[in-house]
UniProtKB/Swiss-Prot annotation:
This is Large ribosomal subunit protein uL18. Belongs to the universal ribosomal protein uL18 family. It comes from the Bacteria. Gene3D superfamilies: 3.30.420.100. The lineage of its organism: Bacteria, Pseudomonadati, Spirochaetota, Spirochaetia, Brachyspirales. One of its GO terms (molecular function) is structural constituent of ribosome. The keyword Ribonucleoprotein applies. The keyword Ribosomal protein applies. GO terms for biological process: translation. It comes from Brachyspira hyodysenteriae (strain ATCC 49526 / WA1). Part of the 50S ribosomal subunit; part of the 5S rRNA/L5/L18/L25 subcomplex. Contacts the 5S and 23S rRNAs. InterPro entries: Ribosomal_uL18_bac-type, Ribosomal_uL18_bac/euk. Keywords: Ribonucleoprotein, Ribosomal protein, RNA-binding, rRNA-binding.
Length: 118
């Protein structure tokens, strides 16, 4: 097993253990984050119905330019405003196996600044 596969396997293990403890409901949906080397995206998901309630991504036209950490913070703010439009004020944060640092932390801080509670 190469280094890349080992890191991916470790993240998948963390992701599984987190998902056992976290489940989104209609009252408190799950805010999940996905990042690649180039993009960051986040979704608010109602696990009981299996639907996405709101989403934001760095691939959107108005969020494309800037540094990754700054863009992640803007994504958090945009996602929080879209959630407020759908009367969602509280969520459960799912870091999806990623370390709570850098882009992930910045996205969470941006969502908190815009009024989302978790």
């Amino acid at each position: 097993m190469g280094l890349r596969e080992k890191i991916k396997a470790q993240r998948e293990r963390r992701k599984r253990s987190i998902r056992i403890k976290i489940e989104g409901s209609s009252e408190r949906p799950r805010l999940t984050v996905h990042k690649s080397l180039k993009y960051v995206s986040a979704q608010i998901i109602d696990d009981s119905k299996g639907i996405t309630l709101a989403s934001a991504s760095s691939q959107e036209k108005d969020l494309k330019s800037g540094k990754n950490v700054d863009i992640a913070k803007e994504i958090g703010k945009v996602l929080a405003t879209r959630a407020k439009e759908k009367n969602i004020s509280e969520v459960v944060f799912d870091r999806n196996g990623y370390i709570y640092h850098g882009k992930i932390k910045s996205l969470a801080d941006g969502a908190r600044e815009a009024g989302l509670k978790f």
